[in-house]
Swiss-Prot record:
Belongs to the phi29likevirus scaffolding protein family. The lineage of its organism: Viruses, Duplodnaviria, Heunggongvirae, Uroviricota, Caudoviricetes. Keywords: Coiled coil, Late protein, Viral capsid assembly, Viral release from host cell. Residues 79-99 form a coiled coil. This is Capsid assembly scaffolding protein. Scaffolding protein involved in the icosahedric procapsid assembly. Coassembles with the capsid proteins to form the procapsid. The scaffolding protein is found within the capsid as a serie of concentric shells. During DNA packaging, the scaffolding protein molecules are released from the procapsid. It comes from the Viruses. Residues 1-24 are annotated as: Disordered. It comes from Bacillus phage B103 (Bacteriophage B103). Homodimer. Interacts non-specifically with DNA; probably binds DNA in the early stages of DNA packaging. Pfam families: Scaffolding_pro. InterPro entries: Gp7 (IPR038032), Phage_phi-29_Gp7 (IPR024374). Transmembrane segments: none annotated. The keyword Coiled coil applies.
Length: 101
C-alpha cells in the first residue's frame, strides 16, 4: 500500500533541507523509491482488474441482449397461440344459435 500523501510531502520537504545529513537523505530517497514501486505495482493490479471487469461487462451486455431477443421471440409465439385459441373458442351466442336450428 502506498504511503499517504502527507507522508510523501513530509519526506519531500525534509529533502529540501540543505543541512540534512547524507545518510538521512539516502534513507528518505530509499523510502520514496520503495513507495514508487508499490504505487506502480498497485496501479498495474488495478489496471488489470479494470480491464477484466470491462471484458466481463461486455460479455454480460451481449448475453443480456441475446436473452432479451429470445424472450421477445417466445412472447410473440405465446401471443400467436393465444390468438389461435381465442379464434377456435365457441361463444355462448354461437351455442344458442346452433340450438335454435
Amino acid at each position: 500500500m502506498p504511503m499517504e500523501r502527507d507522508s510523501h510531502e513530509e519526506i519531500l520537504n525534509k529533502l529540501n533541507d540543505p543541512e540534512l545529513e547524507h545518510s538521512e537523505r539516502t534513507e528518505l530517497l530509499q523510502q520514496l523509491r520503495a513507495d514508487y514501486g508499490s504505487v506502480l505495482s498497485e496501479f498495474s493490479e488495478l489496471t488489470s482488474a479494470t480491464e477484466k471487469l470491462r471484458a466481463e461487462n461486455s460479455d454480460l451486455i451481449v448475453s443480456n441482449s441475446k436473452l432479451f431477443r429470445q424472450v421477445g421471440i417466445t412472447k410473440e409465439k405465446e401471443e400467436e397461440i393465444k390468438q389461435e385459441e381465442l379464434s377456435e373458442t365457441i361463444t355462448i351466442e354461437d351455442l344458442e344459435k346452433q340450438a335454435q336450428l
